[in-house]
From Swiss-Prot:
The keyword Disulfide bond applies. It holds the Pfam family V-set. This is Ig kappa chain V-III region PC 6684. It comes from the Eukaryota. GO terms for cellular component: immunoglobulin complex. Residues 61-92 are annotated as: Framework-3.
Amino acid sequence: DIVLTQSPASLAVSLGQRATISCRASKSVSTSGYSYMHWYQQKPGQPPKLLIYLASNLESGVPARFSGSGSGTDFTLNIHPVEEEDAATYYCQHSRELPRTFGGGTKLEIK
């Protein structure tokens, strides 16, 4: 199985500043010009919401302050400027092969 390691496990960011979350895969999740990495946001009592698919594509309806980048084994989610409603736990997930594993999550607090 591909192991996804997120860092940091938690972070606190001031309103209006930048939040950066990293995800490292134990082997490449990129092939044929695509990077099969996705980012989700989850708030308590709610299902995960897809933010970014295929490393850098913004899901419809997601604010442009969310952006994703990376390829191969190293990926980043950026949120800028952070808003109060962004307080949540963020997860990376790959779909390069089965099982489609998730990272351990990053809890974002807004100061």
